[in-house]
Amino acid sequence: MALKFKFAIASDLHIALPHTIWQHPARFHLVEYSIPAFEEVLSQLATLDLDFLLLPGDLTQHGEPENHQWLSKRLAQLPYPVYVIAGNHDVPRVETFNQFTPHYTQFGFKSGLTEPHKPYYECEVFPNVRLIGLNSNQFDADGQQIGWIDDEQLVWLESVLENQDYALNLVTIHHNVLEHMHDQSRNALGQRYMLGNTERLCKILHQANVKLVFTGHLHVQDIAYSDRYDLYDITTGSLVSYPHPYRVLNYISDESGDRLEIASFRVKSIPEQADLSHFSREWMGDRSHPFVVRLLTHPPLNLSLEFAETLTPELRYFWAHIADGDAQFEFPNFPPVVREYLEAFSDVPPKDNNITLSLNK
């Protein structure tokens, strides 16, 4: 069946009205620019003939009702449909689940009204195309947030995918399903961004021939592929951190086969910050030191703090390079073991920003 549709992705908006901003000297996210950055994206998207916009979670700074209200009102003004899911920042406590979904009944969750307050849904986003929005935000016995899909939701997902009425199923979930950096499921930088029971989810998706998952949370531009599950995990960076990216995607199914054309763009300037790219890269560099030290002093390197500190100046932009996508690293002056480990963070295929993915395997 021939298909052709266009959609955009903007992730981890972290919308924060000025009076709600949490002021902290080590604050990593440029939430004061969340609204102007999003408005710039909407301005650029206004020139396109979009079929829908996808927002894969962390819609707000910390789940503040007034930030959800502002965003839902703004989304309702757009000329194309918008579909959202919850991120960990949107539901910081167990009780906030029931407060989240009512804000977004026009943006995906309306199809779940037979089960009020379920933070997951399915809906048709284009003729013969279904979007499944999953919830990966759970809490452990100590009340700490974890990335996990509960059994009830997985049973629901299997049931939904048994319906073969759609030519294409797309899935969106906040936590990463595949690794987007070296050793992500185990290293000190990336582990908490992974879905804890990703293997079970991937098996379900593979059995249903689902090939495309759209995630957020990590704040990096990356596309990962699993040959085992024939699955792409396309994660998009945050609009409140370098490089302030968004994506425009064209899905095409014709006599040549099925493919997804991906183009990535950046918000480089806003009225409040003329050179946003430079400013935010330096902001990230200024605040990356604790994360780099943690990576160096934790397994598998286990460097002493004293020695790790001697390496950090050359790693000032390490995270910024990863966030930008398609990063390639060389550290010829580092000890061999450290060099080998850090250079393994270089990007591997497929490309992260601009690429056409063939879906015909």
Model-based region annotation:
Residues 255-361:
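A short C-terminal boundary segment appended to hydrolase-like catalytic domains
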Residues 16-19, 61-64, 88-95, 139-142, ...:
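Active-site environment of divalent metal-dependent phosphoester hydrolases
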Residues 65, 69-156, 162, 248:
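Extended active-site neighborhood of metal-dependent phosphoesterases/phosphodiesterases
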Residues 1-8, 118, 122-133, 164-168, ...:
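Beta-strand-turn-beta hairpins that frame and shape the catalytic cleft
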